């Protein structure tokens, strides 16, 4: 037995091209530190083959994610934090195998049918949402460092959505944005259907997270069912 797919591949290549090779994966998760590549070196003749298979169907996961070993500290307002030793980029966070949401505003609302950013039910005649605009200047003023945050809005005529990366703040404290070209008919932002995420100050709901890349610190507000000394954390 060997511990990694890479080692199994190395051993399989030692057999002649006329030999069938059966690589059997035991139950569990196999994390790939780099892309697993099959090349001509892994090929056999037409009458022979190399097979990668699970010993027990459905019990093996090959993951491109990275499992983190973290020491969590409880902070204020139900938010926990942990330092990450390596310099990482986090696009997605999984806790106990469940994908979590970046810190965002407005928050997602549980339930079926909320087809606009998991917050609203699409209404073509909507004029106001009854809550503060995600891009209200008073809200932006509260963000200490929104760089690497995201702005998502619907096209003003609801012909799709558009997205921006926040590059920082301008001298007048407005946002410096890059993007918005995702629709073939440019338009202004929709006045209601707007959402921001990956903003530290918007971390206020269970299941939300924020990663401070400068401090290498991950912030997370756990669900009521999660015990932070026992959770499994994976990133992509």
Predicted regions located by residue number:
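Extracellular polysaccharide-degrading/modifying enzymes targeting complex plant/algal/animal polysaccharides
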Residues: 1-236
């Amino acid at each position: 037995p060997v511990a990694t797919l890479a080692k199994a591949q190395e051993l399989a290549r030692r057999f002649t091209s006329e030999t069938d090779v059966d690589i059997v994966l035991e139950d569990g998760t196999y994390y790939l530190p780099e892309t697993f590549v099959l090349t001509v070196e892994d090929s056999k003749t037409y009458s022979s083959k190399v097979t990668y298979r699970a010993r027990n169907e459905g019990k093996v996961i090959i993951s491109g994610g990275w499992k983190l070993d973290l020491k969590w500290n409880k902070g204020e307002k139900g938010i926990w934090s942990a330092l990450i030793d390596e310099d990482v980029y986090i696009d997605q966070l999984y806790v106990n195998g469940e994908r979590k949401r970046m810190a965002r505003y407005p928050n997602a609302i549980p339930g079926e049918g909320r087809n606009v950013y998991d917050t609203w039910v699409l209404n073509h005649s909507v004029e106001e949402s009854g809550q503060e605009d995600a891009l209200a200047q008073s809200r932006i003023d509260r963000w200490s460092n929104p760089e690497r945050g995201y702005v998502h809005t619907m096209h003003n005529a609801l012909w799709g959505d558009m997205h921006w990366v926040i590059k920082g703040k301008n001298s007048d404290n407005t946002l410096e944005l890059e993007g918005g070209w995702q629709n073939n008919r440019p338009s202004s932002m929709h006045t209601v259907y707007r959402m921001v995420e990956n903003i530290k100050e918007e971390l206020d709901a269970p299941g939300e997270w924020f990663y401070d890349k400068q401090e290498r610190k991950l912030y997370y507000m756990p669900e009521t069912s999660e015990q932070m000394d026992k959770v499994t954390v994976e990133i992509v």
